[in-house]
Amino acid sequence: MIDVRYRNRLGNRMFQYCLGRILAEELDFALQADALPGFPNTRQKIEGLSLEEPEQLLSGQKIDWDEVRADRSHRRIVLDGWFQRYEYYRPWRREIRQWLAIDPAVQAPEIKPGVVVHVRRTDYVQMRWALPFSYYDEALETLLPHGGPVWIVTDDSHDPFLRHFSKWKPKIFRGSPLETMLFMSRSSKLVLSQSTFGWWPAFLGDVESVACPLPQSGIWSAATEFPGIDLIERDRFICLPCTDYRPTRLESAHQLKRQVHRRLVEIAIRSLNLPLVLQPP
């Protein structure tokens, strides 16, 4: 049996589900994994060998991928990690696009020609994983040398950082996480942040050109505190080195205001004994 223990939010869980299903398919094991909301094919029951023990625990990012698949012994494999390495998934891209086909009830427009830019802010600013505008500007100049429509997907449409994009006259796309992911996957050109949420549309869609950061710090950097992550497809992406982001005073003030507001909302919700749901896409 393959037992998937989900961690964190949607983009991360998609890796965990797919790794579990790949192993189930290759080893002829049963798959135990909750369905991912909005992805109806993840409700499919995967039959196979189902044992409770002996147990093999896989965690972290990088695992001995070849050895795990070559071991045909009967066992229960528990997936309790992140597994964010494109080498595990790219050979299965055709199948994964079927497994993670978004519910047809979810709708989003197609923007062609033009480019969709994923600007991840909020928690990334606090963790120093946000990217500088110089990266986005270079990416847009590279993908749109003669100009064209620009759409921004972001988790904070009020962030003054977005004013840097004014010369591109961008439009802001607003939608649910699934609508946003579908919208990004339908673009012809895509600018990534160092985020799993943005990586998946580039993998699942038919995006012609993808600009990708090579950051000095953050989860996709060589200096990451989470070693083993490797989602940068250097043979497919246009990879652009970028410096660390340094917020302006206005941007810092905005982030402080956000944090104070969020804290007040949390206090109010807890005082009313309501469930706390504060998850930016």
Predicted regions and their residues:
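Short acidic-hydrophobic, aromatic-tinged amphipathic segments that line or gate anion-handling sites
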Residues: K171-G175, G228-T243
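Short helix-capping/linker segments at secondary-structure and domain boundaries
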Residues: I2, E25-L31, E208-V210
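Secretory-pathway luminal glycosyltransferase catalytic domains
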Residues: D3, L36-G148, I238-P281
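Short amphipathic alpha-helix
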Residues: Q16-L23
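Donor-binding and catalytic core of enzymes assembling or modifying cell-surface/extracellular glycoconjugates
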Residues: L10, L144-G228
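A short, glycine/small-residue-rich beta-strand->loop->alpha-helix junction that serves as a flexible
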Residues: Y6-F15, Q126-W129
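A short beta-strand-loop structural module common to alpha/beta enzyme folds
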Residues: L27-P40, T154
